[in-house]
Amino acid sequence: MKVITTRLNNGLTIATQKILESESVTTGLWIKSGSRNEAAAEHGLAHMLEHMAFKGTKKRTARDIAQEIEDVGGEINASTSVEITGYFSHILPNDTDLAIEILSDIICNPVFDSQELEKEKHVVLQEIGSNNDSPSDIVFDHFMAVAFKEQAIGRPILGTEQSLQTFQPKDFKNFMAKHYYGENMVFAGVGAVDHDKFVKSVENYLGDLPKQQEKHQNKPAKYIGGRIIDPRELMDAQIVMGFEGCTYLKPHFYTAQLLSLILGGGMSSRLFQNIREKLGLCYSIYAFHWGFSDNGIFGISASTNKEGLEKLIKTIIEEIKLLTNNISENELKRAVAQYKAAIIMSHESSAARAPTIARQLLTYGEILPNKEIFKRIDNITITDLKKLSEKIFFNSKPSIAAVGPVENLLSTEELSNLLAQ
């Protein structure tokens, strides 16, 4: 199923993928702008903007936006990440133009009413409160904050109570003027979609979108590392430990993905088998690798009780050291199969394909066919895995964040010493 792209005169890229058996369409607008594009005084603005876009336009109230889509059985939503914001809808084919028009309206004509803003601040404050009350969520905020200290990429996407209170309507207009322009966007449609009709519809509503504003380059993300604890009276401690990873723009990204699968991807992984199954030290444990445009983070997440915390961390470090010395062909083969299957399975629905297409175009400027990604994965060797594991685990200061009964958590110096032994 081929992805067809068209670029409008204003730089906006339109991409469609027709799925013959599909009876619906996922369409949306994705912008290469997220929380890391915020200045310090704008912390949380990208996410709040996503909320405010649905709070009314020059021709629609917030209720109108929701009702017009739901009157035809559709859905509309949005999401904000570190580097990309998306506004999207899932509708029946005959309502594709309606969805495109509404999505275009909330991007081009938001009113940012001051009363609606004050109400939405309270909504997002509850979202922040819910996140802060969840140890398994807040520990990741702490982890990113210590890994990328005092940088936008390390700040929580939701913002804080203090930062939200300062926002005014003009702040959203200024942020959109900087980042919401044609060359910084992709409008994608996947499912029962006709490319020519889709392009005509998008051009009709977004053809006058500005082509390019003054480009604002993000400061390169600099990995720092360190330790942060959040003592709470809980039964279990939630921890995330990690190291500097790889940008998704470099070939090593795929090697890092395989490393995370071998170490802690699934029930057959080393961490799960050796730490949970054999030793019973925790209920949940897994490894992950997140790539960004100029950096990445490799991490391990786990939970255990107060008595088992130190042993858990020391055992994780032992598993890391073993990984750099011995990786079997069977482990590599299994990780490759897992990664390929995950990619294929993630493309089974139009709701998953549309953002994937948009992100690839915003990230790489092209669509990476599965066979090209699989070729890169198949070319990874055990030697590649060992070399990268040494670079990741022994060339950067560890980061560790913990929530719960964690007052006696090992320091980063102690972690580094254990790794060096």
Residue ranges and their predicted role:
Residues 16-18, 287-288:
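Short amphipathic beta-strand and strand-loop transition segments with alternating hydrophobic
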Residues 1-3, 9, 17:
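Short, low-structural-confidence N-terminal segments
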Residues 24-26, 236, 297:
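Conserved catalytic motifs of the protein kinase core domain
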